[in-house]
Amino acid sequence: MPTDSDDHVDRRTVLKYAGTAGAVGLAGCSGNGGGGSGGGDGTGGGNNSDGGGSDGGSGGDTFELGVTMGQMDSGLDPQDHAETNTEIITGQMYEGLLDRDKEGGIIAGLANEWERTDDGSVRFTLRDGVTFHNGDDLTAEDVRFSIRRIVFNDVGIVSPQTNDLGPVSEVTTGDGEVTVSFDGYNPIAFQLFATNGDVMQQSWVEEHGSDYINRNANGTGPFRLTEYQSGNVVRYGPNEDYWDGAPAVDELSMSASSESSTRVNQLLAEETDIVTNVPPNEVSRVNSSDVATINSVASARIIFLQMRYDVEPFSSQQFRQAMNHAVDVGSIIENVLNGFGNLTAQPTLEGHVGYNPDIEPYPYDPAEAERLVEESGYAGAEITLQTPIGRYLRDVEIAQAAANQIDSLSNVSCELQQREFSSLVQDVTAPSIEDRPHFTLLGWGNAEFDGSQTLTPLLSSEGALTVLKNDELDGLLEEAETTRDSDERVDILQEANQLAHDLAPWVFMHQQFSVYGVSSDISWEPRADEFIDPDTATQQ
């Protein structure tokens, strides 16, 4: 079996950036043929189209499907982005070794067998008969190249997904198999590969530059690119040679409108078929129409108010606990979100590995909040809550309600500062904790469905987005990183969640719902991980 050694990845670097890339978790979770300018390699090119495309609206004998999101992609390189919307757009054309069903379970992808070896490595057996959109066969060397391009910064690009596959130390191939070794033991290797690691063709990538790769596509997925208008629309046609059968959709288009009201109006005008993030106040208008309905699902995203432990008054655990008692999250879910949310009490969502069912939410108790503020020594504190504008479902309205409730305490005043997400995320992801905001409304998506992928990046001392340093919590998370017994690992993560609840580095808010408007002409079910898979849609 031929082998090549790869560069060593330091384990503390993995702890620092564990989980999905920072911007993905915050922003996120989620191809191609034709006569493009690619000169005959089967890729779509620039603004050219061989498939006609569609601006949306299903009808007639041709199944045309339009999807309208809040934002477009940042380019079509599936390994060079860190946003959920880009993953949705590229994920129609590219796919990984493993996949997930809509409930989050791990299923086969480009690999139809997978196993852990005695030394802790993981081995994937590739399915036969898979071809790229240009007609070339998928090989184990393509998979090896793709993993290395993501993980190692000297293989073409510095990928923002560098740590998404864990502490990879070596990738070897042989006889239709790919073996991935790690620096230490990786207990969630298969979870990571079920969410990350889109595969590209090595020769195609090496032949073209970054600009070309970001405007064209050559994957193995169910759809081929037919037209790409940067920032405007992406059009696809079915991959008739797809290994799992061609999708029913004949013409797929993905576009965006940042205004939720505009998206809803397009849906009701039958100009598109699926729209994302329908505001709760628009739900009744959609449901009462004759052309569309609401389809919602509890997502893998948690919303919270993050407090930096090293600045006053948030340096006091009592003050942080007081903020949890000061915010009436249940009322916010009912009145601001129209019930589209679930109360949370810990960083790990129900159904994810490590969730602790014994932890109860902090009760809304302004008197207790005022008492704890007095005990903290920070009576009279003046604080400012920063919130993104339009990134999460009703984020500004949620933040305003929370700030008002805190401000109503007799011994704390709270103001609200609204910020564009593109600006705020730069501060939140600053390399040093000293440069991060003090008090911020944020969301985090955990597409791996494993508690460590929220706890480690957000709350460990070396976490990429941490606002906390606690030796006991660090010890638990490091133990969870290396424990091979799955039951023991669950116990460790449950203990870590209890400690995080008690330390109260966040005001624990809610589990966000994904609320979609869906045309009555189609049948389509949303997923918990926020990925949109049009290949599962059917005509009514």
Describe every region a protein language model picked out.
Residues 2-5, 9, 16-20, 24, ...:
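Detector for C-terminal structural segments
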Residues 65, 374-445, 459-461:
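Ligand/substrate-recognition segments at binding pockets and active sites
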Residues 115, 162-205:
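Surface-exposed binding/hinge segments that line
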Residues 1-62:
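Haloarchaeal acidic low-complexity proteome signature biased toward cell-envelope/secretome components but also
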Residues 235, 239-285, 296:
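Ligand-site clamp/hinge motif
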Residues 113-155, 313:
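Aromatic- and charge-enriched surface segment that lines or borders ligand/interaction sites
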Residues 44, 315-404, 408:
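Append "and occasionally in soluble cytosolic enzymes with long acidic Gly/Pro-rich linkers
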Residues 86-117, 153, 169, 194-225, ...:
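Short, solvent-exposed loop/beta-turn-alpha elements that line the ligand-binding surface or hinge
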